[in-house]
Amino acid sequence: MNIKDIGVIISKKPLKENTFIIRVFTKNHGLYSGVIKASSKKNKFIYQEGNIVDFLWQARLHEHIGIAKCELIKSYTGYFIINKAKLYAFNSVKFLIQELFHEREEHSIFFAFLINYLDNLSKNFCFRDYINFELNLLAETGYKIDLTKCCVSHVTTDLTYVSPKSARALSYKVGKPYRDKLLILPKFLLSEDSKITLEEKKQALTLTNYFFNRYLFHNNRQVEARKEFIEYITNI
């Protein structure tokens, strides 16, 4: 059987000399793995992590790992490796996708979001964009955090907290009596124009980390690349 799609290479591991297993996050078929041969310099460039490719997968049976062939559409790798913030962000992104998405499970809408994120990241690292990636990833896996209004009073102003139980925002007035049990809602998530402080970065990462740990990182397992990103971005 054959599958043809567009995708982003998110993993490349050696199998034997000049032979690798790549993992590609595709638009219409989700994560797919395949064996490739990359003997020439040109082929090795095509199969770098972060590249957008036309992806062809062939196997006798669907459950087989299959043989993969790719044609390069766009390469982002060079933009990421020259900037630490971009590189750490991309590494976190690719490992989160591998950790949280099931093999061969379609995520076509999220794929479009990812392509837009990578395009923006290639131009400039933006912490707001990264957190929006994590929020979108949580939503895609079924755990959307609703920051549009207070879940009790329904007001849309003075939103200050997030309930760890409902994953919904709370106003300052409603949440104040329970503030020790609530998560802080960073102000920059409510306003595109606000400057992001170091404290707000930590608050935002604490917010998404809580829901990753509660629902998705089983047995408190952490994604090492995400930990490295957090360590870097909160110490610059």
From Swiss-Prot:
Protein keywords: DNA damage, DNA recombination, DNA repair
Top-level division of the source organism's lineage: Bacteria
Annotated Gene Ontology cellular component terms: bacterial nucleoid
Pfam families: RecO_C, RecO_N
InterPro entries: ARFGAP/RecO, DNA_rep/recomb_RecO_N, NA-bd_OB-fold, RecO, RecO_C
Gene Ontology biological process terms, A to Z: DNA recombination; double-strand break repair
Family as reported in the entry's similarity comment: Belongs to the RecO family.
Described function: Involved in DNA repair and RecF pathway recombination.
Stored HAMAP family: RecO
Name assigned to this protein: DNA repair protein RecO
Organism: Rickettsia typhi (strain ATCC VR-144 / Wilmington)
Organism lineage: Bacteria, Pseudomonadati, Pseudomonadota, Alphaproteobacteria, Rickettsiales
